[in-house]
Curated annotation (Swiss-Prot):
It is an enzyme of class 2 (transferase). It is found in: Cytoplasm. One of its GO terms (molecular function) is 23S rRNA (guanine(1835)-N(2))-methyltransferase activity. Its main location: cytoplasm. Specifically methylates the guanine in position 1835 (m2G1835) of 23S rRNA. It catalyses: guanosine(1835) in 23S rRNA + S-adenosyl-L-methionine = N(2)-methylguanosine(1835) in 23S rRNA + S-adenosyl-L-homocysteine + H(+). It comes from Pseudomonas putida (strain W619). GO terms for cellular component: cytoplasm. Its EC number is 2.1.1.174. This is Ribosomal RNA large subunit methyltransferase G. SUPFAM superfamilies: S-adenosyl-L-methionine-dependent methyltransferases. PANTHER family: RIBOSOMAL RNA LARGE SUBUNIT METHYLTRANSFERASE G (PTHR47816:SF5), RIBOSOMAL RNA SMALL SUBUNIT METHYLTRANSFERASE C (PTHR47816). Keywords: Cytoplasm, Methyltransferase, rRNA processing, S-adenosyl-L-methionine, Transferase. Belongs to the methyltransferase superfamily. RlmG family.
Length: 374
């Protein structure tokens, strides 16, 4: 893999999650452009720089020896990547503080470097939260590959930060620089809420939660076919989002024990709040993690999963395949994985490579619900 070479450092970076023979690199031309632009400003060593949405730590790891840098974002995998890439390049793994998107920053920043996220609601929430954290003369510099840079990103910077200057294109990347100007205080439109009729629930969704404005059609197809009569089974909701699958299942399985896990900190925050609203003080484990990687082998009886098919702008079934492998490791012999998936993804044949038996529980014109038994 090529090294990231900038005026700040030469770094050997890897992506997360680890994939054998991964053809994708852990940085792009937008990272390079952003670092070149910042270096040209010759910031003092005591300058405070906040880095947002740094997918694999390329920005923060480049800056760690040159300014006081803090990284923040909504991805547990990005946090893991930052720590691994710092250590991989001879730095202390914890030398850059990381603030999850569900928590708040401390102090003021002279520069904020933003990788424009796929979900613009996350960008909007982050820009609103920056109010009160920008030092006089601060700049917010957003970077993206042009094909992933919507006009709305510049409009949000203008609305919440100040006048925006777009750069020339460089290697198909562009920067948007906003000079801090006092704006009237803005209240956040997040979290959003929506109601379900069956089961009767009101669900809260923080800014980066998938389908935050309404139930996604895959989950809608899945809900009527969730397993019943589970007794005191140990159940995991893998990639839980706002927690709707686990919560709906828990309502009909009062003795079962639930673990909800997602790599999005905002999803975990939403799931925790939704569980409490629906089920009060009933015991539950809700955590941000790399799927079931940290779960003890053969410790679960049931896994529920509506697997994702993209990681930021990268589309594919590699995350789903990894989740299926993790579920197999975590399930007891005889345990079952229940999933929903688009018909065209061919999950039945993939599951058959890992599990003893795979059956179709239900189907719609677009989705299949499958049960895979270990």
């Amino acid at each position: 893999m090529p090294l990231l070479t900038t005026p700040y450092a030469e770094l050997d970076l890897i992506r997360q999650p680890d994939q054998a023979n991964d053809p994708l690199q852990a940085f792009d031309a937008a990272d390079e452009y952003l670092l070149e632009q910042l270096h040209a400003q010759q910031l003092a060593a005591e300058s405070r720089v906040l880095v947002l949405n740094d997918s694999f730590g390329a920005l923060a790891a480049s800056l760690v020896d040159h300014v006081s840098v803090v990284s923040s974002g909504d991805s547990h995998l990005a946090h893991m990547a930052l720590e691994k890439n710092l250590a991989r390049n001879g730095k202390a793994f914890d030398s850059v503080p990381f603030v999850p998107a569900s928590e708040h920053w401390q102090g003021h920043f002279d520069r904020v470097l933003v990788r424009v996220p796929k979900t613009l609601a996350l960008l909007e929430e982050q820009l609103i939260r920056l109010q009160g954290h920008l030092a006089p003369g601060a700049q917010v510099i957003a970077a993206a590959m042009i094909k992933h840079l919507p006009r709305a990103a510049g409009e949000l910077l203008e609305k919440y930060i100040g006048p925006v200057q777009a750069s020339l294109a460089q290697k198909k990347a562009r920067l948007l620089t906003a000079n801090f100007a006092q704006r009237p205080g803005a209240s956040s439109p997040y979290p959003t809420r929506y109601r379900l009729d069956s089961p009767a629930l009101e669900l809260l969704n923080h800014a980066n939660v998938f389908c935050r404005d309404g139930l996604d059609i895959g989950t809608r197809a899945f809900l009527p076919h969730l397993p019943r009569d589970l007794g005191n089974a140990r159940v995991a909701d893998l990639g839980c989002g706002n927690g709707v699958l686990a919560i709906a299942n828990a309502l009909t399985n009062p003795q079962a024990h639930y673990t909800l896990v997602d790599e999005s900190y905002m999803a975990v925050q939403s799931a925790q709040e939704n569980w409490q609203a629906a089920l009060g003080d009933r015991a539950v484990t809700v955590l941000a993690g790399d799927g079931l990687a940290g779960v003890e082998k053969q410790s679960l009886d049931v896994v529920l999963c509506n697997p994702p098919f993209h990681q930021q702008q990268v589309v594919g079934d590699f995350l789903a395949w990894r989740m299926f492998q993790q579920a197999r490791e975590a399930l007891v012999v005889g345990g079952a994985l229940y999933i929903v998936g688009n018909r065209h993804l061919g999950y039945h044949s993939k599951l058959a490579r890992l599990f003893r038996g795979v059956e179709q529980v239900a189907a719609t014109p677009k989705f299949v619900i499958l049960k895979a038994r270990k």
